[in-house]
UniProtKB/Swiss-Prot annotation:
This is Tyrosine recombinase XerC. Forms a cyclic heterotetrameric complex composed of two molecules of XerC and two molecules of XerD. The gene is xerC. Residues 1-85 form the Core-binding (CB) domain. One of its GO terms (molecular function) is DNA binding.
Amino acid sequence: MNEQVEAFLRHLADERNLSANTIAAYRTDLEQFCEFLHGRRLFAWHDVTHDDVLAFLIDLRERRYASSTVARRVAAVKSFFTFLTGRGIVQRDPTERIDSPKVDRDLPRALTPRQVDELLELPLRSPTPERIRDKAMLELLYATGVRVSELVALNVNDVDLERNEVRCIGKNGRVRVLPINGSAATALEEYFDISRNQLARGSGSSTEALFLNHRGKRLTRQGFWLILKQYAEELGLSDLTPHVLRHSFAVHMLNAGFDLRAVQELLGHTSISTTQIYTHLNHESSHTPHAHPAPRASEVNGVRDEQALVPEEK
């Protein structure tokens, strides 16, 4: 069974050009499905029936997985069997009459402008090369709304401080050129002037990566999560994640009067409906409501609304 799973994952990478993170999620979902089938004494894909897939769905629900997780795993199984039937490995798709579960779409959490300012000021209370780097990362993350995977993938030549722009490669290789505000530009300048060379000494070879760990290697997503967790604990923000900063960027942009389409382009959303969920949020959704955005939040991108549309490079 594993052989077919590996063939499917190669298909996702080579023919559908999915990202490594998406493929890793498919792998996790299908490995859990395989484990479930083995528990039912099933070891060949052509032996899997509609009832087996339905039992897997019921098992996920009984184990109280989030509706979004259940929907994702069912979608992975359905895609996998579409692949198997298309290759003639199985004759009949057992997922044909399995409906994708409805997902309860929770409103994303966003920080207040005051909480954002407190977070962005925290690293330099005890400046070290690492914390100067952290300051630059947090400023850039909030100023652009990039995903954490996009942040850690940035290279030095993606940053243009003369134009105050950052070139970002998003999902499916889509490129966005994003304006950055003065706070982010200053933090990046200080990182380049003070910290990056010191961090790079930890490695025996040069690297084009923008953000480096203490060994001089490219910082990973997991590494950034651990850094953010440390600052979250210092501020008492137990549920702070990288995506909360992305949500905060979107909410504060919209609350400051930016056009929905402009924010969609900045975030790299392919569908406007994904961006529209942020219109249901305002600063009252946080514990410390504000009538107006704080100064840093109000200049989130350092540009006026009509300048915010970011053309996608072909």
